[in-house]
């Protein structure tokens, strides 16, 4: 018997759909009750021991057949009351109307051992009223990617939803991976995602777009009371303080993305968390050879709206859509603009902090922003790996800056040789700056190690684990998870996980470009 205790405030305090079941429908409520659809043979593939501990689940319970049944969608623990949430959103810059949880079903809000609230949500557990004709399922490859990235991002220090479990369903799912007319049967899986809240910008956009100001206000009041309890005040002042905090949290999240080289890939407003958490791991990727114009999403290959370098601007635009949705609650629009200004101020402050940390400086001067921009330009021109470049700078000697320190960061040997003079020039400039800085060498290196990961979840690493799992060997998933639990540490015997992208992965599906098919 589980020790999980549930307090399902969302279902209790927001208006729900009087009809139950997964029949497709437009509704003017916050949520719909829907049960997961049973699967043939649920089996646990991997789990996060840390997340289980927070929830109070011990090893015996995780290993039990009942656990796989519950988190495979075949059973419920006492207190679980499954629901799917209704929301809208802007997708690739255009209003898309009602969207909702098309294949995500929340089981309940569990109270953790730390007293925190943790919503447990199954992704791939079958159709809901918001599935828009789809089957509500997920394939193993995308589920592995979501499971691993949720935990990898947490250990990188990036605000994120978490993952408790990855369960194979024993059923096949038909998907056309690149929407090119070649559907295939793939193994199915279900991820249990965990977050204090899965509320998105789109939860506020939909009722506002429909003119349902009463429901909009209910969403705002509920969100503040449950998820922002420290906020004080009332009325418009309370709403203004809340919106400013949403903007600040979003800025912090995106600044972390830019620090570690993460590209979300599909920053639609329905994929933006009101808590400033990274949510919905689809066609994401990590920057290998530095390119601010890179996106891993094939759907965005032409427009590149969601490319790496524009993520801060897109986040600001998305917050603008949220402000637009909230405008009916504000007689004076000035507080909304103030919130948007807080995003810019917070992001710039984070960027300066991260610049100092990544370069090992006590503080960031204005000229240091120029210094790091010059490095980025050099990385782009010379096809240098972002992660390996910054990590390689840690052990650089300010007295004898040697370009050989960064040899492993180059993808093209000819460019390494040709661009050696420019790199030497930049290193000398950097070394001169270090000699002016008050941080002792040991403190500098320690600061840099905490800002520049050695291990990131490169797409080719995830794909190797997927390949093994699809052949019946899931051990690679847990092994990769263990590596990503300590991304800033040097891990003896695990150098292969820190290597730059191999040439075979440059253009391979799943390693360079991905689709939204999952």
UniProtKB/Swiss-Prot annotation:
Catalytic reaction(s) noted: L-seryl-[protein] + ATP = 3-O-(5'-adenylyl)-L-seryl-[protein] + diphosphate; L-threonyl-[protein] + ATP = 3-O-(5'-adenylyl)-L-threonyl-[protein] + diphosphate; L-tyrosyl-[protein] + ATP = O-(5'-adenylyl)-L-tyrosyl-[protein] + diphosphate; L-histidyl-[protein] + UTP = N(tele)-(5'-uridylyl)-L-histidyl-[protein] + diphosphate
| A family per Pfam | SelO
Task: State the UniProt keywords alphabetically.
Answer: ATP-binding, Magnesium, Manganese, Metal-binding, Nucleotide-binding, Nucleotidyltransferase, Transferase
* HAMAP family hit by this protein: YdiU_SelO
Q: Where is the composition biased (Basic and acidic residues)?
A: 1-10
The GO terms describing molecular function are: AMPylase activity; ATP binding; magnesium ion binding
Q: Which cofactor does it need?
A: Mg(2+); Mn(2+)
* EC number(s) stated in the UniProt entry for this protein: 2.7.7.-, 2.7.7.108
Residues annotated as binding ATP are 100, 102-103, 123, 135-136, 193, 200, 280
The record ties this protein, via PANTHER family, to: PROTEIN ADENYLYLTRANSFERASE SELO, MITOCHONDRIAL (PTHR32057:SF14)
* Residues at which Mg(2+) binds: 271, 280
Instruction: Kindly provide the name given to this protein in its UniProt entry.
Output: Protein nucleotidyltransferase YdiU
Q: What does this protein do?
A: Nucleotidyltransferase involved in the post-translational modification of proteins. It can catalyze the addition of adenosine monophosphate (AMP) or uridine monophosphate (UMP) to a protein, resulting in modifications known as AMPylation and UMPylation.
Q: Where is the active site?
A: 270
Q: Where do the segments described as Disordered lie?
A: 1-23
- Family the entry assigns: Belongs to the SELO family.
């Amino acid at each position: 018997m589980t020790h999980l205790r549930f307090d399902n405030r969302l279902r209790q305090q927001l208006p729900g759909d009087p009809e139950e079941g997964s029949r497709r429908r437009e509704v003017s409520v916050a949520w719909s009750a829907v049960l997961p659809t049973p699967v043939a043979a649920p089996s646990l593939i991997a789990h996060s021991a840390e997340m289980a501990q927070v929830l109070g689940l011990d090893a015996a319970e995780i290993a039990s057949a009942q656990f796989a049944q519950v988190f495979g969608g075949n059973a419920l623990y006492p207190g679980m009351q499954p629901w799917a949430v209704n929301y809208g959103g802007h997708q690739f810059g255009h209003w898309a109307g009602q969207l909702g949880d098309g294949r995500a079903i929340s089981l309940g809000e569990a109270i953790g051992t730390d007293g925190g609230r943790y919503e447990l949500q199954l992704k791939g557990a079958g159709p809901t009223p918001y599935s828009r004709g789809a089957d509500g399922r997920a394939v193993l490859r995308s589920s592995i990617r979501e499971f691993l990235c949720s935990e990898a991002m947490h250990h990188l220090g990036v605000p994120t939803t978490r993952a408790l479990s990855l369960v194979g369903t024993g059923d096949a799912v038909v998907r056309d991976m690149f929407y090119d007319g070649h559907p295939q049967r793939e193994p199915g899986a279900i991820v249990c995602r965990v977050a204090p809240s899965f509320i998105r910008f789109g939860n506020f956009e939909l009722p506002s777009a429909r003119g349902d100001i009463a429901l909009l206000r209910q969403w705002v009041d509920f969100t503040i009371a449950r998820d922002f309890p420290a906020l004080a005040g009332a009325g418009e002042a309370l709403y203004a303080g809340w919106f400013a905090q949403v903007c600040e949290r979003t800025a912090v999240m995106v600044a972390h993305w830019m620090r570690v080289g993460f590209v979300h890939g599909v920053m639609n407003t329905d994929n933006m968390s009101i808590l400033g958490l990274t949510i919905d791991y689809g066609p994401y990727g990590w920057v290998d050879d530095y390119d601010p114009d890179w996106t891993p999403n094939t759907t965005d290959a032409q427009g590149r709206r969601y490319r790496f370098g524009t993520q801060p601007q897109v986040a600001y635009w998305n917050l603008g859509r949220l402000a637009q949705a909230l405008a009916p609650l504000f007689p004076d629009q000035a507080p909304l603009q103030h919130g948007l200004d807080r995003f810019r101020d917070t992001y710039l402050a984070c960027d300066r902090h991260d610049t100092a940390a990544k370069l090992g400086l006590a503080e960031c001067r204005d000229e240091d922003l120029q210094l790091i921009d010059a490095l980025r330009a050099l990385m782009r021109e010379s096809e240098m790996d972002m992660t390996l470049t910054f990590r390689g700078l840690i052990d650089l000697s300010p007295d004898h800056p040697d370009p050989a320190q960064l040899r492993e960061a180059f993808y093209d040997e000819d460019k390494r040789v040709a661009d050696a003079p420019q790199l030497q020039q930049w290193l000398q400039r950097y070394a001169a700056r270090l000699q002016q800085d008050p941080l002792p060498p040991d403190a500098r290196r320690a600061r840099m190690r905490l800002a520049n990961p050695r291990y990131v979840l490169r797409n080719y690493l995830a794909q190797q684990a997927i390949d093994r799992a699809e052949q019946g060997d899931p051990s690679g998933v847990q092994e990769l998870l263990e590596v990503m639990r300590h991304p800033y540490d040097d891990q003896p015997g695990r150098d292969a996980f820190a290597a730059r992208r191999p040439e075979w992965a440059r253009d391979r599906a799943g390693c360079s470009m991905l689709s939204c098919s999952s």
